[in-house]
Amino acid sequence: MTFIEEFIYKGYLHQCTDLDQLTAITQEVKIAAYIGFDCTATSLHIGSLMQIMILRLLQKHGHTPIVIIGGGTSKIGDPSGKEVTRKALTQEDIKRNTAGIKKSLSKFIKFGKDQGDAIILDNAEWLDSLNYLDFLRDFGRHFSVNRMLTMDSVKLRLERSHHLSFLELNYMLLQAYDFYYLSKHYNCILQLGGSDQWGNIVIGADLIRRISGKEVFGMTTPLLTTASGAKMGKTAAGAVWLNEDLLSPYDYYQYWRNCEDADVIRFAKLYSELDIIELNKFEHLVSEDINAAKKQLAYELTKLCHGERLAKLALETAVRIFEQGDIDENLHTFILAPEILQAGISAYKLFYNVNLARSKSEARKIIRGKGAKINDQLVEDENMTIDTNFLLDKKVIKLSVGKKRHILVKV
């Protein structure tokens, strides 16, 4: 398959400015294409995973992926998809977050100076030195405020009478300038992003045509949710981070292992590099095969993110916990102050304190519903006192909620 054919097959395509022409160009020559990431956290999470897999796909087909870290634009904040103004980031925040995002990306993409290697740039390199008056004179006249106000990211805020600062309105101008800069200095002809970026991408492509007469393209990916409608990248316990200092490889594995049955085939196409033969097997699964497919999916995706060794360790840990009933120290661990167990703590409070319940009342409800276990024994009394007598040989207490949520409490 060509790049565009595989792009469509895997389910990445939502919109394209001129798909036929872009298809023809990518079949004739190798192109440079870019995706931007703002520095809003110290790691990317799986909400960005589709964009990362697209960068890998570009590299696979011999095209040059360009990654833009938004060290400059993060000082403003993208209003796309947001109903409120984002909190401003300090220079220290941006520096710390940039390092973490580079770590996330380096798990998946080969950066370097050889042909086909990905390029990583920080748009602060050119945005920080922009002269405002020169920018207004040379570029401001090419932007239509009328058109900007029709963009979904702006229109949503205005329709709901939510505050939209002039600073945020400038975000799309700077993103358009990013595209222009990359087109001029790196011969980049394609910008990719989520569906909420369509307006910003089109404005950038239009700016390039007006100034240089060059034809460039934009493509967006669909907004992804799980089969039940939950937003990708978020769980009740928090974000599904790519960096292991924020989420263990085991917990990453378990997220994919516990995905909904209806999502298995789609996730395999979107996020794995299984070949077509393997993917076709996924499409013809019968109900009794679904758990085996989930294990394979979880293993493949964990291997992509954390490497083969840690993926195997996560798989082995899951087998011991769920299929053999052993306690494994690679399970997620919560450190409890020794004096708490020495004094004793009610069972429902312990489940709440280690984040297995969102509130004390929920913890009580779980126990009353026969959904809580301590050291694999059902908890009958929500008020029973848990103390040092519950510590096992490894000086841990195993807490479980249902069949899939487990934690080791250490003192």
From Swiss-Prot:
Give the catalytic activity: tRNA(Tyr) + L-tyrosine + ATP = L-tyrosyl-tRNA(Tyr) + AMP + diphosphate + H(+)
UniProt GO MF annotations: ATP binding; RNA binding; tyrosine-tRNA ligase activity
Motif 'HIGH' region: chain residues = 39-48
Chief subcellular location equals cytoplasm
Domain S4 RNA-binding spans what residues?
A: 345-411
- Cross-referenced SUPFAM superfamilies: Alpha-L RNA-binding motif, Nucleotidylyl transferase
> What biological-process terms (Gene Ontology) are attached?
tyrosyl-tRNA aminoacylation
Gene3D superfamilies the UniProt entry points to = HUPs, RNA-binding S4 domain, Tyrosyl-Transfer RNA Synthetase
The record's EC number reads 6.1.1.1
Asked if the keyword Protein biosynthesis belongs to this entry, the reply reads: yes
Q: Which Gene Ontology CC terms are recorded?
A: cytosol
The motif 'KMSKS' region: which residues? Answer: 231-235
Report the subcellular localization. Answer: Cytoplasm
- Similarity-based family: Belongs to the class-I aminoacyl-tRNA synthetase family. TyrS type 1 subfamily.
Q: Which HAMAP family match?
A: Tyr_tRNA_synth_type1 (MF_02006)
Subunit description: Homodimer.
Which purpose does this protein serve, as stated in its record? Catalyzes the attachment of tyrosine to tRNA(Tyr) in a two-step reaction: tyrosine is first activated by ATP to form Tyr-AMP and then transferred to the acceptor end of tRNA(Tyr).
Protein name from the UniProt record: Tyrosine--tRNA ligase
Q: Which organism is it from?
A: Rickettsia typhi (strain ATCC VR-144 / Wilmington)
